[in-house]
From Swiss-Prot:
PROSITE patterns: IG_LIKE, TIR. This is Single Ig IL-1-related receptor. It comes from the Eukaryota. Interacts with IL1R1, IRAK1, TLR4, TLR5, TLR9 and TRAF6. Upon IL-1 stimulation found in a complex at least composed of IL1R1, SIGIRR, MYD88, IRAK1 and TRAF6. Upon stimulation with LPC found in a complex at least composed of TLR4, SIG1IR, MYD88, IRAK1 and TRAF6. Interacts with PALM3. The keyword Transmembrane helix applies. The chain crosses the membrane at residues 119-139. The gene is SIGIRR. It comes from Homo sapiens (Human). Induction: Down-regulated during inflammation by inhibition of an SP1-mediated pathway. Gene3D superfamilies: Immunoglobulins, Toll/interleukin-1 receptor homology (TIR) domain. GO terms for biological process: acute-phase response; cell surface receptor signaling pathway; negative regulation of chemokine production; negative regulation of cytokine-mediated signaling pathway; negative regulation of interleukin-1-mediated signaling pathway; negative regulation of lipopolysaccharide-mediated signaling pathway; negative regulation of Toll signaling pathway. SUPFAM superfamilies: Immunoglobulin, Toll/Interleukin receptor TIR domain. It is a single-pass type III membrane protein. Mainly expressed in epithelial tissues such as kidney, lung and gut. It is found in: Membrane.
Length: 410
């Protein structure tokens, strides 16, 4: 049956042309497998390997292993030939083809591996480095702004603690320190940022022990700011017992704020400065530079982070202490007018020493009529007092005296 025996083999491997790039010194196995028609009148199949179209001699760089399996009905035989190639020189590279009964299907092409391309890796590394640099730049530029936003949004509120001042400022009684405190520190913190300061140029810790006045004043303030100038450091307790004094201050107030100056960095031999740098985790150490005078400098942002969170009031709601009480005392009303010296001016703080800031109009109260100067103080004293509604007023004890801030104001 020569027609049956002439049927072309069915190649299983390679199913298509393959390109391999083995490195020098490595080895690779090329597998050629096919189903071949078998029969009593068919010759035994044989596999022949070709390299670049020429018969390949076995030996040297090559090794050959052949296997065959016959079907149960003896109609086909599975022929497999595995060519082992040792890539020891560049002469081994080329196109390898297996041929069965002078019929070949696909080939293996061995190519020399070119130099490894590191372009992708270099580009990826540069992108990662650029991203890290950008993140570091954003952290340096925006860190304080993000911290300020977080403090304003989620910081601890320290309003209803009974304290009158946001910070106690201790400084030396010398012209330079007075100018710094009164013309730079106080205007920036009080007028621009709404804090209330208590200024004191007396010795903070005479004989390294707090005085009675200091204890009282610190109890009225939420923070302690020390202007650590050269004149301040010249005090006796700063040179001889600063460690003991610092321990006393840490007992009296939370995380005191020390303002140092750039000129002191050149001479860090003072024991107080060395001690503060060693205990940065217990205190807030700020550095004043020549460029810190601008309102947008990082110095003021760091000071604001160290000070309590400020609560912004809505002026339309007025004083939260009296907004629900309709507290209009008839003793202050003379013939439907407000006496001189008690005009309801919403822009003037009626309690400048207190902690409520500028009060707005009382909730539900009509605006005060424009004041006329026709009534003098002497005439006011001689006028009759309108007491017609005294009996209808509630004079019971006030229960909301210390509820200065409602939840809506937070």
């Amino acid at each position: 049956m020569p027609g049956v025996c002439d049927r072309a083999p069915d190649f299983l491997s390679p199913s298509e042309d393959q390109v391999l790039r083995p490195a020098l010194g490595s080895s690779v196995a090329l597998n050629c497998t096919a189903w071949v028609v078998s029969g009593p009148h068919c010759s035994l199949p044989s596999v022949q390997w070709l390299k670049d179209g020429l018969p390949l001699g076995i030996g040297g760089h090559y090794s050959l292993h052949e296997y065959s399996w016959v079907k149960a009905n003896l109609s086909e035989v599975l022929v497999s030939s595995v060519l082992g190639v040792n890539v020891t020189s560049t002469e081994v590279y080329g196109a390898f083809t297996c041929s069965i009964q002078n019929i070949s299907f696909s080939s293996f092409t061995l190519q020399r591996a070119g130099p490894t391309s590191h372009v992708a890796a270099v580009l990826a590394s540069l992108l990662v480095l650029l991203a890290l640099l950008l993140a570091a730049l954003l952290y340096v530029k925006c860190r304080l702004n993000v911290l300020l936003w977080y403090q304003d949004a989620y910081g601890e509120v320290e309003i209803n603690d009974g304290k009158l001042y946001d910070a106690y400022v201790s400084y030396s009684d010398c012209p330079e320190d007075r100018k710094f405190v009164n013309f730079i520190l106080k205007p920036q913190l009080e007028r621009r940022r709404g804090y209330k300061l208590f200024l004191d140029d007396r010795d903070l810790l005479p004989r390294a022990e707090p005085s009675a006045d200091l204890l009282v004043n610190l109890s009225r303030c939420r923070r302690l700011i020390v202007v650590l100038s050269d004149a301040f450091l010249s005090r006796a307790w700063c040179s001889h017992s600063f460690r003991e004094g610092l321990c006393r201050l840490l007992e009296l107030t939370r995380r005191p704020i020390f303002i140092t100056f750039e000129g002191q960095r050149r001479d860090p031999a003072h024991p107080a400065l060395r001690l503060l740098r060693q205990h940065r985790h217990l205190v807030t150490l700020l550095l004043w530079r020549p460029g810190s005078v601008t309102p947008s400098s990082d110095f003021w942002k760091e000071v604001q982070l160290a000070l309590p969170r400020k609560v912004q009031y809505r002026p339309v709601e007025g004083d939260p202490q009296t907004q629900l009480q309709d507290d209009k005392d008839p003793m202050l009303i003379l013939r439907g007018r407000v006496p001189e010296g008690r005009a309801l001016d919403s822009e003037v703080d009626p309690d400048p020493e207190g902690d409520l800031g500028v009060r707005g109009p009382v909730f539900g109260e009509p605006s005060a009529p424009p004041h006329t100067s026709g009534v003098s103080l002497g005439e006011s004293r001689s006028s009759e007092v309108d007491v017609s509604d005294l009996g209808s007023r509630n004079y019971s004890a006030r229960t909301d005296f210390y509820c200065l801030v409602s939840k809506d104001d937070m």
